[in-house]
Amino acid sequence: MPHFLAKLDFKPLKYPLIEGDFCFHKEFLSLKNPTKSCVYASFKDRIFLLQKIRRANDFLIKSEKTTPLKREILKQALRIYSQSFEVISHNLQENSKHASGKKALDLGTFEDFIQKNQAPILAEIGFGSGRHLIELAKNNPTKTCLGIEIHTPSIAQALKQIELLDLKNLHILQGDGRLILESMPNYKCEKIFVHFPVPWNEKKHRRVLSEKFLNEALRVLKPRGFLELRTDDGLYFEDSLKLALKNFQCEIEIKKNAQIPVISKYEARWNKLKKDIYDLRIYSLELNETPFYNHAFDFSFDTITMSEKSVGTILKTKKIIQEGYFVHVCNIYENKGDFLVELSMGDFDWPVRLFVLLTENQIFYLNKSPLKTLNNHKAHLLLQNILSQKGIG
């Protein structure tokens, strides 16, 4: 991660610091940990935060992951900010020409991307090495291919291949496929692939394919579209088949040890060991009449006034856990009556770290709201109550 180390003895900074398209507006001091602060900054119209941590012999200044910038822009921001310090060391050199310039989709703009997309969508959830996903995009140039993955190295590998092969129809999104599917409107996908997911036979609640996931998939699929599960785990296959058969009306296609054009490294290993591989296709037969409410979820805040007393109470509030979701106020930073609230919140399956800015006139999430799912919206309403001091036990 781009960062620099600076000596402790330096003159207090006079904000704002402005150079070119960068502005370092002000510094918020942690009310929980006196050695930490957040620098509130912007590049053009994009807000971002820098973490400033006082250690025994130096300051560590780095980016705050919840407000990401493109790597080279972030390095430039840190180089500019470092001019106000006596730098001990840094890793802010110009980027290697071999690094990939292709970026994953941002969860904050995913809703807009989906709404604007007009081509049929082929989605793969948990694409691993990316072999199947890459071939899917190469063989379907007129369709939008979407790869959803939580594993960062897999994402980096796929992005390099996309750039190398110039696959303009392939997009990558980092996140939990279960929640992303829930946030998508009806009839957006033509096909959904789930190949070799972790079986979680001892913790079945952690599986990708559950009754809720299947219902969401059938809602999102176009008529005659299908969800394809490919697995080497017999129990996972049997449980998934039982889930499919619970539907009043369904069409199912089953194959065992079918030969397919693209074989992943994982599958090649099992083929050598003569291990059985199961395919289960579940077709969407008709228009799903389940209404899609997620687009109506409102993540704005009512007016909230913060005082020293309320801030102290909020900081002492323990993590509040409800069925399927939670809210935890991790820290509060302050600057002349303005507050930055650091949060961990949302759905248990894919919690998010966010910052909320509270000033005299406004309150909002920095850069992005939580993904529009039911549990995230419930967490947002709970957060509203916490910040306004309603219903805190």
Swiss-Prot record:
<keyword id="KW-0489">Methyltransferase</keyword>
<keyword id="KW-0949">S-adenosyl-L-methionine</keyword>
<feature type="binding site">
    <location>
        <position position="176"/>
    </location>
    <ligand>
        <name>S-adenosyl-L-methionine</name>
    </ligand>
</feature>
<comment type="function">
    <text>Catalyzes the formation of N(7)-methylguanine at position 46 (m7G46) in tRNA.</text>
</comment>
<comment type="pathway">
    <text>tRNA modification; N(7)-methylguanine-tRNA biosynthesis.</text>
</comment>
<keyword id="KW-0808">Transferase</keyword>
<comment type="similarity">
    <text>Belongs to the class I-like SAM-binding methyltransferase superfamily. TrmB family.</text>
</comment>
<protein>
    <recommendedName>
        <fullName>tRNA (guanine-N(7)-)-methyltransferase</fullName>
        <ecNumber>2.1.1.33</ecNumber>
    </recommendedName>
</protein>
<keyword id="KW-0819">tRNA processing</keyword>
<dbReference type="InterPro" id="IPR029063">
    <property type="entry name" value="SAM-dependent_MTases_sf"/>
</dbReference>
<dbReference type="Pfam" id="PF02390">
    <property type="entry name" value="Methyltransf_4"/>
</dbReference>
<dbReference type="InterPro" id="IPR003358">
    <property type="entry name" value="tRNA_(Gua-N-7)_MeTrfase_Trmb"/>
</dbReference>
<feature type="binding site">
    <location>
        <position position="124"/>
    </location>
    <ligand>
        <name>S-adenosyl-L-methionine</name>
    </ligand>
</feature>
<dbReference type="GO" id="GO:0043527">
    <property type="term" value="C:tRNA methyltransferase complex"/>
</dbReference>
<feature type="binding site">
    <location>
        <position position="149"/>
    </location>
    <ligand>
        <name>S-adenosyl-L-methionine</name>
    </ligand>
</feature>
<dbReference type="InterPro" id="IPR055361">
    <property type="entry name" value="tRNA_methyltr_TrmB_bact"/>
</dbReference>
<dbReference type="GO" id="GO:0008176">
    <property type="term" value="F:tRNA (guanine(46)-N7)-methyltransferase activity"/>
</dbReference>
<feature type="binding site">
    <location>
        <position position="232"/>
    </location>
    <ligand>
        <name>substrate</name>
    </ligand>
</feature>
